[in-house]
Amino acid sequence: MSHFSTIRTKIKNKPELIEALQLLQYDVQEDQELINPLNHQHEKVKVDVSIGNDIGFRLNNNGEYELVADIQTWKDPVPPKRFVEKVTQQYARMTVHNQIKEMGFKVEEEWEMDDNTIELTVTRWV
């Protein structure tokens, strides 16, 4: 029997989560109810951010977003664990970009390395 599973993350900010998903080319919807894929008999789940009718993120009691999806009917070509890693990396990128901007800096250059690390060069005129 199929059911919605959750995968915990350390993601805490909704705006950066949405930006990260959009950078990864996902169509993002807010405040949606996930539906039972293939008419499986499990309860509907309300999520804060969704990227389809059966995949989303909801805020848990620890103030962190968790991925909610029916893993048995996962359609994305990227496996769930790798998907969370990619979203987390883009979330970190957006968080750093937003903090840099708040501090008055500007990103001059950005590189994604072969090992998937990201390097930035930032400047600020004083």
At which residue positions do the language-model features occur?
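Interaction-mediating elements
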Residues: 1-126
